[in-house]
């Protein structure tokens, strides 16, 4: 693997997963397929998590209340991603919660309007993540707490690669189907790099037990949700990819906070 090619893949992945602008020259001749691109999702997560992590560091350094700092950091993260993953979580919650059959669930998920299940899922997602991040901030230095954001961002986006590769598209005409199925090698590289990033960021800052807890939480949450979606929808959609990221981020932050 060439470093230049991986750097280009990372930049394209950042553009796909966020609203961070990237040079148009990187997309010249690019067909939009994501089969290989998922290998760069964890490192794209680091880039995406940098700005909210910096905000958390500055706020905690100014002795802001940890919960307030966590909420502001997560709000900035939503702005950076354009609420891409939150939208997927809400649509998936509406579809699974309101649909009585696979077909009805998929139809509901196409509706751009948010329902009761989606609203509740969004509220709980933000509340639980903010609470967990606040716990981490209260028991850590500002720099250590800030490192949790890119670490969890990398792990949760590695989980997207797993979910995407392990399930066939639920809809032949869906957006996820049009971008292609991730390569097995790309998925494995994404998982390995996500674990490496977590080890480099979490172990020195928090210790071995929080690292193990974070890895287990991401793995269990990603595996369980993928199995659940396989049973409910018999395949992935763009929305379930976003929901995977959110669920794994929630689980990992909670595990990290509990293991301190």
Curated annotation (Swiss-Prot):
Main location: membrane
Keyword set includes Secreted: no
Topological type in the membrane: Multi-pass membrane protein
Residues that span the membrane, as ranges: 40-60, 64-84, 117-137, 142-162, 188-208, 209-229
Presence of the UniProt keyword ATP-binding in the record: no
Enzyme class, broadest EC rank: transferase
Essential cofactor(s): Mg(2+)
GO terms assigned for molecular function: adenosylcobinamide-GDP ribazoletransferase activity; cobalamin 5'-phosphate synthase activity
EC number, UniProt record: 2.7.8.26
Location(s), subcellular: Cell inner membrane
Catalysed reactions, as listed in the record: alpha-ribazole + adenosylcob(III)inamide-GDP = adenosylcob(III)alamin + GMP + H(+); alpha-ribazole 5'-phosphate + adenosylcob(III)inamide-GDP = adenosylcob(III)alamin 5'-phosphate + GMP + H(+)
InterPro entries: CobS
One Gene Ontology term, aspect cellular component: plasma membrane
Any Pfam family hit: CobS
Biological or metabolic pathway of the protein: Cofactor biosynthesis; adenosylcobalamin biosynthesis; adenosylcobalamin from cob(II)yrinate a,c-diamide: step 7/7
Keywords: Cell inner membrane, Cell membrane, Cobalamin biosynthesis, Magnesium, Membrane, Transferase, Transmembrane, Transmembrane helix
GO BP annotation list: cobalamin biosynthetic process
Function per UniProt: Joins adenosylcobinamide-GDP and alpha-ribazole to generate adenosylcobalamin (Ado-cobalamin). Also synthesizes adenosylcobalamin 5'-phosphate from adenosylcobinamide-GDP and alpha-ribazole 5'-phosphate.
PANTHER family per record: ADENOSYLCOBINAMIDE-GDP RIBAZOLETRANSFERASE
Recorded family membership: Belongs to the CobS family.
HAMAP family: CobS
Protein name: Adenosylcobinamide-GDP ribazoletransferase
Lineage: Bacteria, Pseudomonadati, Pseudomonadota, Alphaproteobacteria, Hyphomicrobiales
